Curated annotation (Swiss-Prot):
Binds 2 [4Fe-4S] clusters. One cluster is coordinated with 3 cysteines and an exchangeable S-adenosyl-L-methionine. Catalyzes the methylthiolation of an aspartic acid residue of ribosomal protein uS12. This is Ribosomal protein uS12 methylthiotransferase RimO. It comes from the Bacteria. Residues 4-118 form the MTTase N-terminal domain. [4Fe-4S] cluster 1 binds at residues 13, 48, 81. It catalyses: L-aspartate(89)-[ribosomal protein uS12]-hydrogen + (sulfur carrier)-SH + AH2 + 2 S-adenosyl-L-methionine = 3-methylsulfanyl-L-aspartate(89)-[ribosomal protein uS12]-hydrogen + (sulfur carrier)-H + 5'-deoxyadenosine + L-methionine + A + S-adenosyl-L-homocysteine + 2 H(+). Its cofactor is [4Fe-4S] cluster. It comes from Clostridium tetani (strain Massachusetts / E88). Residues 141-373 form the Radical SAM core domain. Its EC number is 2.8.4.4. Belongs to the methylthiotransferase family. RimO subfamily. Keywords: 4Fe-4S, Cytoplasm, Iron, Iron-sulfur, Metal-binding, S-adenosyl-L-methionine, Transferase. GO terms for biological process: tRNA modification.
Length: 444
């Protein structure tokens, strides 16, 4: 019997990527994975439905993949946040889709595909769940030397602009022993860098242990053989404790890199956003981090054009960015998401004002990064090799998240392996990237 060929298109965030990797692990037991949609008997589109742009990208991708039903494709499957949020509506709007699964129903994937192939049945499963997740096996879609490691699912923060709690459910931590087991599995399969993710990593453990236990988890991850770098994302400022900051200073495997989603700094805007912190708390946390760990690279994300954001609020945000000079910064225009409290707030900001404010902040950030990178010339960093483009090796130091932040380009006389770590001396700077050379000097 000819094996079914599956094609998978994964959109959206790193949590979605993990979902795709779990699905691929399941379907490869029954068939073959192909990267060419023209060859696929079954195409799965794992969607993002977080903001308007991501919804549009998801719909466009579904329609693009539906064209292959004129050729070899027999079943088109849509999974992920968009189907969880709009399942029934999408099923009516997109008759080309055979199977629609939400984020809690991936265990029904194989049966739904089988019913579609054998009986022509359409399936819709978009159930809401607060069960604790267990990743099981995964097929990595990243380079083999790094992987994302999810420690919790869902969110209890209920920011007024965000639909994630409605899509992903309440916050559910995984047991420490399950996380450590997965980290060991990843290490045994060649992973050297694990990137810790959740909607909010700093809340980890509160729901199952009665206290926030992220520092304890990081200590245990440090003991996993083969893991050289641990990178931590999505740390909410109000939950960054002295204990966590101390762990950054102590833990030799924990990269001096942290992602802290701040979103804004004006107290009036933060209050309307439903954020738990305020300007005083945020600035104190950032200063405490830099005081205890001076080499810490802090990434953050900001939202401009939130309802009621006045010019003085935006000026306060610009002053904040100028003062703290983040190594990595993402700036997003507020997206009016239906079903969220912010969508019906008064004083919605015009789209052109949002765009102007975003461009202004990004111009500031380009100048800031230019200055930061200039100070790196002649310094030596440990760099992991991510790729080779035929002329240069492409790598990252501890300050760089793969595929998101900048990169370091360098040449080497000998052949290097992907995932190998080398010492690189920085020679030149580009806008966000660096150019260097392999050197014999020590690095860490």
């Amino acid at each position: 019997m000819t094996k079914i060929k599956y094609g998978v298109v994964s959109l959206g965030c790193d949590k979605n990527r993990i979902d795709s990797e779990v699905m691929i692990n399941e379907i490869k037991k029954e068939g073959i994975i192909t990267n060419d949609p023209k060859e696929a008997d079954v195409i799965i589109v794992n969607t993002c439905g977080f903001i308007e742009d991501s919804k549009k990208e998801s719909i466009d991708t579904i329609l693009e993949m539906s064209n292959y039903k004129n050729n070899n494709c027999k079943v088109l499957v849509v999974t992920g946040c968009l189907s969880q949020r709009y399942g029934e509506e999408l099923q009516e709007l997109l008759p080309e889709v055979d199977v629609m699964l939400g984020v809690n129903d991936y265990d029904k994937l194989s049966d739904a595909i089988k019913k579609s192939i054998e009986k022509g049945e359409k399936s819709l499963y978009c159930n809401y769940s607060n069960t604790v997740i267990n990743e099981g096996g995964r097929v990595l879609t990243t380079q083999k030397h790094y992987a994302y490691l999810r420690i919790a699912e869902g969110c209890d923060n209920f920011c007024t602009y965000c639909a994630i709690p409605k899509i992903r459910g309440k916050y559910r931590s995984r047991k420490i022993e399950d996380i450590i087991e997965e980290a060991k599995f990843l290490s045994q399969n060649g992973v050297k860098e694990i990137i810790i993710v959740a909607q909010d990593t700093t809340r980890y453990g509160l729901d199952i242990y009665g206290e926030k236990t992220l520092p304890s988890l990081l200590k245990q991850l440090e003991e996993v053989d083969g893991i050289e770098w641990i990178r931590l994302l999505y740390c909410y400022p109000e939950d960054i404790t002295e204990e966590l900051i101390e762990e950054f200073a102590r833990n030799k495997k924990l990269c001096k890199y942290v992602d802290v989603p701040i979103q804004h700094i004006s107290d009036s805007v933060l209050k309307r956003m439903g954020r738990k912190g305020n300007k005083q708390l945020v600035t104190k946390v950032l200063r405490d981090i830099k005081k205890r760990v001076p080499e810490m690279s802090i990434r953050t994300s900001l939202i401009v054009g939130f309802p009621g954001e006045m010019e003085e609020d935006f000026k306060e945000l610009k002053d904040f960015v100028e003062e703290f000079k983040f190594q990595n910064l993402g700036v997003f225009k507020y997206s009016q998401e239906e079903g969220t409290p912010a969508a019906t707030m008064e004083d919605q900001v015009l789209e052109e004002i949002k765009e102007t404010r975003r461009e202004e902040l990004m111009k500031m950030q380009r100048d800031i990064v230019k200055s930061i990178n200039a100070d790196k010339v002649n310094k030596v960093y440990k760099v992991v090799v991510d790729n080779f483009n035929g002329e240069h090796y492409i790598g990252r130091n501890y300050e760089m998240l793969p595929e998101i932040d900048g990169a370091i380009y360098f040449k080497c006389d000998k052949i290097l392996n992907i995932g190998e770590m080398v010492c690189i001396k920085i020679l030149e700077t580009l806008e966000y990237d660096l150019i260097g050379v392999v050197c014999d000097e020590s690095c860490k």
